[in-house]
Curated annotation (Swiss-Prot):
Xref: CDD domains: serpinG1_C1-INH
Residues the UniProt record annotates as site (Reactive bond for chymotrypsin): 469-470
Protein name, entry field: Plasma protease C1 inhibitor
Site (Reactive bond): 470-471
Length: 504
């Protein structure tokens, strides 16, 4: 016979079942491997609510803290472990590079990638930057002294190169300033090794800021210098170079035609018109395969500061171990800066010209000491020391007798550039800023100088008779000498050369 369940018995059975379930749940939770929990999916994490127990308590709360407390602690712990696992899997996606926002998040079940991103390389400077036609005021202020120094060094280099090319004991004249202007105009479009080689030849610092603007400011009214680039029709010139060249040098490359004779006439006519017909024929021929021609012509239009005596005077001059008679300039009281240089063993005299120019003569102290000996001792250091001493010397009334100055010199500059160990014009020329054509050579490069100084001066000589004092300084030039036309304002050589035979 079945026993009857009393209310008390039923209550005891319910409490016993609740405790048994709670103990089994705690045992189940505590026996789980945390690693297994971490490797589970996000969906397996229990929800935070009161429905975890299979027995639903309706309207009645338990007075046994161990049952509900154990269940609550286990669930919170599981939530924390699951959340930490989720965060660990999601973190790699948060560490993606900022410049790749389109990449998808990393899957939590996938192993992390071991591939490393390629290293970021610094941007490289273009091999052929566009011509720089701008400079700052601060760079402009410092560039004048730098350019003056460079032109002075370049002058000595050129002197020895011209001397090595010319025949012994012959006259020569050139304009360092004018040649530097032409080469710097080429430098405007040079790239790679051609650019650095030109900078070395010209004694420029690397990437010389404002050199083009400073050269333009160095122009003198007493000197007329013209440069021009001519090219064949098949050579396309970049617009950037044309614009920069026109802005900085007042000229842009001119295209030649198919007729060689017409091209020769075009070039010589241009030179004559731009030198006031002082130079009428710069070229006597032009190669049939001409692609690029560099031309430069310069002449002196300045005059003496004081007029020399107008009467004709002939005097002796030492030429090739014999004395010849040559026309002389003379003045009984010409303002002159004068001293003897022991390094060159030379008398150094400086005469003033118009337009802040001066004419410097270096002549051996005695007939036994020759001009060739002076040339061997001439280097940039000695040259600068002489010019510095002249700057500090006073002009004093001096008896002057010297040959009339008339020198005309024409020179193939390609041979001069090779003497300077610059071979780019004929072998490995890079003018990427001027043209895209990689196969380019300079067909011809010519430089012509005309230098003439007669008795005429800016200021007339006094009409009254001048008595010569016994202690008056004397400067007589009666043997071969080295000369220099110096810009006193900007301190650089405009002309340089030598005179062996004043009659030539």
């Amino acid at each position: 016979m079945a026993s009857k369940l009393t209310p008390l018995t039923l209550l005891l059975l319910l409490l016993a079942g609740d405790r048994a379930f709670s103990d089994s749940e705690v045992t189940s939770h505590s026996s789980q491997d945390p690693l297994v929990v971490q490797e589970g999916s996000r969906d397996s994490v229990p929800e935070r609510d009161g429905s975890r127990s299979p027995i639903e308590h309706t309207g009645q709360s338990s007075t046994w803290p161990t049952t509900s407390g154990s269940t609550k602690i286990s669930n919170d712990t599981m939530d924390q472990v699951a959340n930490e696992s989720f965060i660990q899997h999601v973190q790699p996606a948060a560490q993606l590079p900022e410049d790749s926002p389109s990449q998808s998040p990393v899957n939590s079940s996938s192993p992390p990638s071991t591939a490393s991103a390629p290293p970021t390389q610094a941007p490289t400077e273009p091999l052929c930057p566009e011509p720089l036609a701008w400079c700052s005021d601060s760079d402009r202020d410092s560039s004048e002294a730098t350019l003056s120094e460079a032109l002075t060094d370049f002058s000595v280099k050129l002197y020895h190169a011209f001397s090595a090319t010319k025949k012994a004991e012959t006259n020569m004249a050139f304009s360092p300033f004018s040649i530097a202007s032409l080469l710097t105009q080429v430098l405007l479009g040079a790239g790679d090794s051609t650019k650095s080689n030109l900078e070395d030849i010209l004694s420029y610092p690397k990437d010389f800021a404002c050199v083009h603007q400073t050269l333009k400011a160095f122009s003198s009214k007493g000197v007329t210098s013209v440069s021009q680039i001519f090219h064949s029709p098949d050579l396309a010139i970049r617009d950037t170079y044309v614009n920069a060249s026109l802005s900085l040098y007042g000229s842009s490359p001119r295209v030649l035609g198919p007729d060689g004779d017409a091209n020769l006439k075009l070039i010589n006519t241009w030179v004559a018109e731009n030198t006031n017909h002082k130079i009428n024929e710069l070229l006597d021929s032009l190669p049939s395969d001409t692609r690029l021609v560099l031309l430069n012509a310069v002449y002196l239009s300045a005059k003496w500061k004081k007029t020399f005596e107008q009467k004709k005077m002939m005097a002796s001059f030492l030429y090739k171990n014999s004395m010849i008679k040559v026309p002389m300039l003379s003045s009984k009281k010409y303002p002159l800066a004068l001293f003897n240089d022991q390094t060159l063993k030379a008398k150094v005299g400086q005469l003033q010209l118009s337009h802040n120019l001066s004419f410097v003569i270096m002549v051996p102290q005695s007939p036994t000491h020759q001009l060739e000996d002076m040339e061997k001792a001439l280097n940039p250091t000695v040259f600068k020391a002489i010019l510095k001493k002249l700057e500090l010397s006073k002009f004093q009334p001096t008896y002057v007798m010297m040959p009339r100055i008339k020198v005309k010199s024409s020179q193939d500059m390609l041979s001069i550039m090779e003497k300077l160990e610059f071979f780019d014009f004929t072998y490995d020329l890079n003018l990427c800023g001027l043209t895209e054509d990689p196969d380019l050579q300079v067909s011809s490069m010519k430089h012509e100088t005309v230098l003439e100084l007669t008795e005429t001066g800016v200021e007339a000589a006094a009409a009254s008779t001048i008595s010569v004092a016994r202690n008056l300084l004397i400067f007589e030039v009666q043997q071969p000498f080295l000369f220099l036309l110096w810009d006193q304002r900007h301190k650089f050589p405009v002309f340089m050369g030598r005179v062996y035979d004043p009659r030539a």
